[in-house]
């Protein structure tokens, strides 16, 4: 894997810097490095593809070295270099695709394609060994079963979940009280609602709670907490739990009271915040518990009182909500996030070449399915294919 990264980095640098008019002295070190790559690869044969519709391709390396010059690089020099660069780039691209479409239930962190297995040989270590990529560093750590650490921006840690629970209901669905939520990606939105605006509740107050368990532990997380859930701030028609009917949700938004968010690890509270909004942090956690209250306003103008009558019919629903958004965090496991396209790269290649469903990943690389059942086998394979996707992205956008 590190050899593949070194190949890609050398080729990227060569493609960017070996251009007509450049002083040879400015790129002499790069050209020596490029020549070392050619010397190491010459005489070797590789085969890629042969799975799904990914065609079989044979690769033979027999290239001349780039020479030295006292002057600027001329058009002939650059054209010779370009021909070599283009072939090598095409080779790396195909090795990456071949690796991205393969999976294994056992030791999925290790190279799965014949071409990458061959590149893992000791003879290829002479190719500008470079271990500076975060993905490569973590791949090496995971390969040795040592602790890894990825930094993510808006990590897709929450499987998609959108539903509601009713703490008070009746067949007519005209006096409901409960909680509805939407968890997806890096965001939780949860709302508590009461048709009667807590008119008969103790102290005219309704208590709500929402607990979310993560599939992986997050550490050093920067989080935004807001006293609102905008996705539940407009009217909608909702299917009943049994699917037999529908009911009307017509919210009027109030500010939540006694808001508390707890971050837990293995059932132990690590961080707690009360009535604190904006930016907060959590050290390490695998569970988030949100609790908040809806309090009936003790004093109301006639217009507000008309929204929340003392008896049925209730045409509006008093609603309070919270939004929790994970802005950044560190995780030992690889995840899809907002700043990278690894999941899209892997999925698009597998779709383009009609790769059959294997023993590890769900059909279509469905992320909700994948993260919901994030087994050690999936973790190993995902880290490997994401690492390869990061290497490919250096050369192919």
UniProtKB/Swiss-Prot annotation:
Broad class of the protein's primary localization:
virion
Return the GO cellular component terms, semicolon-separated.
Answer: T=13 icosahedral viral capsid; viral envelope; viral intermediate capsid
Residues engaged in binding Ca(2+) = 266, 286
- Residues bound to Zn(2+): 153
Q: Which Pfam families match?
A: Rota_Capsid_VP6
Molecular function (GO) terms for this protein are: host cell surface receptor binding; metal ion binding; structural molecule activity
Q: Which GO terms describe its biological process?
A: fusion of virus membrane with host plasma membrane
Lineage, top-rank taxon, reads: Viruses
Keywords, A to Z, come to:
Calcium, Capsid protein, Intermediate capsid protein, Metal-binding, Ubl conjugation, Virion, Zinc
What does UniProt say on post-translational modification here? Answer: The N-terminus is blocked. Sumoylated with SUMO1 and SUMO2. Sumoylation of viral proteins seems to have a positive role on viral replication.
| Region annotated Interaction with the inner capsid protein VP2, chain positions | 62-73
Where, per UniProt, does this protein localize? Answer: Virion
Q: Key word Isomerase present in the record?
A: no
InterPro entries, per the entry: Capsid_hemagglutn (IPR008980), Rotavirus_A/C_VP6 (IPR001385), Virus_capsid_a-hlx_vir (IPR008935)
Question: Gene3D superfamilies annotated for this entry?
Answer: 2.60.120.170, Viral capsid alpha domain
Misc remark? The VP6 trimer contains a zinc ion located at the center of the molecule. The zinc ion is not essential for either trimerization or transcription activity of the DLP. Zinc-depleted VP6 has an increased sensitivity to proteases.
Query: What is the stated purpose of this protein?
Result: Intermediate capsid protein that self assembles to form an icosahedral capsid with a T=13 symmetry, which consists of 230 trimers of VP6, with channels at each of its five-fold vertices. This capsid constitutes the middle concentric layer of the viral mature particle. The innermost VP2 capsid and the intermediate VP6 capsid remain intact following cell entry to protect the dsRNA from degradation and to prevent unfavorable antiviral responses in the host cell during all the replication cycle of the virus.
Membership in a protein family: Belongs to the rotavirus VP6 family.
Q: How does it assemble?
A: Homotrimer. Interacts with the inner capsid protein VP2. Interacts with the outer capsid glycoprotein VP7. Interacts with the outer capsid protein VP5*.
Q: Please give the name of this protein.
A: Intermediate capsid protein VP6
């Amino acid at each position: 894997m590190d050899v593949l990264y070194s190949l890609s980095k050398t080729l990227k640098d060569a493609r960017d810097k070996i251009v007509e008019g450049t002083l040879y002295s400015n790129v002499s070190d790069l050209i020596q490095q490029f020549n070392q790559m050619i010397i190491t690869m010459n005489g070797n044969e590789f085969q890629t593809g042969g799975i799904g519709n990914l065609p079989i391709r044979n690769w033979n390396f027999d290239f001349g070295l780039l020479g030295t010059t006292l002057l600027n690089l001329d058009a002939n020099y650059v054209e010779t270099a370009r021909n070599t660069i283009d072939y090598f780039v095409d080779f790396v691209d195909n090795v990456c695709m071949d690796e991205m479409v393969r999976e294994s239930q056992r030791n999925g962190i290790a190279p799965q394609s014949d071409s990458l297995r061959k590149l893992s040989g000791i003879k290829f270590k002479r190719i500008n060994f470079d271990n500076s990529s975060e993905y490569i560093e973590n791949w090496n750590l995971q390969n040795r079963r040592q602790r890894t650490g990825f930094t993510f921006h808006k990590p897709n840690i929450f499987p998609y979940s959108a539903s509601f629970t009713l703490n008070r209901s009746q067949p007519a669905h005209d006096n409901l009280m409960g909680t509805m939520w939407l968890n997806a990606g890096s965001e939780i939105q949860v709302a508590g609602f009461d048709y009667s605006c807590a008119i008969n509740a103790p102290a005219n107050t309704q208590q709500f709670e929402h607990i979310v368990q993560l599939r992986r532990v997050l550490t050093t997380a920067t989080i935004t907490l807001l006293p609102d859930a905008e996705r539940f701030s407009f009217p909608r028609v909702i299917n009943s739990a049994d699917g037999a009917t529908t009911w009307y949700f017509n919210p009027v938004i109030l500010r939540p009271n006694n808001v508390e968010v707890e971050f837990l690890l293995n059932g132990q509270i690590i961080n707690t915040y009360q009535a604190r909004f904006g930016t907060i942090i959590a050290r390490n956690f695998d569970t988030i518990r949100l609790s908040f209250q809806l309090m009936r306003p003790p004093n109301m103008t006639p217009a507000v009182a008309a929204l929340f009558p003392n008896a049925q019919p209730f045409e509006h629903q008093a609603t309070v909500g919270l939004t929790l958004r994970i802005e950044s965090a560190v995780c030992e496991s690889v995840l899809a996030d907002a700043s990278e396209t690894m999941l899209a790269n892997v999925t698009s290649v597998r779709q383009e070449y009609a790769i059959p469903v294997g023993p590890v990943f769900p059909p279509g690389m469905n992320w909700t399915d994948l993260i919901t059942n994030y087994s050690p086998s999936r973790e190993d394979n995902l880290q490997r294919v994401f690492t390869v996707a990061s290497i490919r992205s250096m050369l192919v956008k």
